Design a protein with these regions (language model features):
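Bacterial N-terminal signal peptides that target proteins for export
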Residues: 1-7
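Short helix-onset patch at the extreme N-terminus, typifying the N->h transition
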Residues: 7-8, 23
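C-terminal motif of bacterial Sec signal peptides marking the signal peptidase cleavage site
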Residues: 14-16
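OB-fold nucleic-acid-binding modules
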Residues: 18-104, 108-265
């Protein structure tokens, strides 16, 4: 696919691809990991931020992208054991931290929390905040945490059936197939709108042939938010989250990166 070609080209020109407002450090060598994201996740005790006082380094590849604005000021890093969301706090991250880039995360001095079931790292949130952690507050702070290599490779999602999803997959890039749209918060049924009028923004609910369901969440600011959802059976790719569907029942949700994360089944 064209995106794989773009990723290969990025691996060649990465050094010069950022703009003057966003100059991350990069290196041909980055620190080795001394633990895994899975192990870090096991150590985290939910419902409170955890301070990392010791030297903790994890390595992985970026699986998210803000290129189409469905992700905002964060990156997801996956080391093939688990995934973690870095609260970067900068814009247009896909230019400097593209999908498939190998990075090392120096987590000493950071706080670890959780949001929508996904492990997060950043600075400690204010006491009045409803979140565990907040965005890193400067370019310098970001450069301390994220060490960027020049190694970019295509990312391949994990193919799963809905019935096989569990909490170990939270934060990871999944592809779920045989999905049919059954509900969307984007339509007003009282006004006579139907699923033929549904667009991506908000929540949409899908079922497979076995009747298992999964939700898709799309930000209103995503570039494809107002594009019509295909009504054929689909394969959908995205980062797995867990939270309230349309403010009600909690369930697994996918958050797509690009509109092309939706493909015919």
């Amino acid at each position: 696919m064209w995106r794989s070609l773009v990723i290969k080209l990025l691996s060649i020109v990465l050094v010069g691809c950022y703009n003057a407002a966003d100059k991350p450090n990069f290196s041909t060598t980055i620190p080795e990991a001394n633990t895994s994201i899975e192990r870090l996740k096991e150590q985290y005790v939910g419902n409170r931020a955890m301070f990392i006082k010791d030297e903790v380094v994890v390595r992985g590849r970026i699986t998210s992208s803000d290129a189409e604005n469905n992700f905002y000021r964060t990156i997801i890093v996956d080391d093939q054991t688990a995934a973690i969301e870095v609260m970067v706090g900068l814009n247009t991250l896909s230019k400097s931290y593209p999908e498939g880039l190998l990075v090392a995360l120096n987590l000493q001095g950071c706080y670890v929390g959780e949001s929508y079931g996904v492990l997060q790292v950043g600075r400690k949130a204010e006491s009045y905040s409803s979140y565990d952690v907040d965005y890193l507050d400067s370019r310098e702070a970001v450069d301390i945490v994220i060490r960027r290599s020049q190694d970019v490779e295509p990312i391949h999602p994990i193919d799963l059936n809905i019935c096989n999803i569990n909490k170990s997959h939270l934060g990871r890039l999944l592809r779920i197939s045989d999905l049919q749209l059954v509900y969307s918060t984007s339509i007003d049924t009282l006004a006579g709108e139907t699923l033929h009028d549904a667009c991506w923004r908000g929540y949409s609910l899908y079922k497979n042939s076995s009747g298992d369901s999964i939700a898709i969440y799309t930000r209103n600011y995503a570039s494809f938010a107002n594009h019509t959802i295909p009504l054929e059976r689909l394969s959908l790719t995205g980062i797995l989250q867990y939270g309230k569907y349309n403010g009600a029942k909690e369930c697994y949700q996918l958050k797509m990166r690009y509109e092309e994360d939706c493909q015919p089944y």
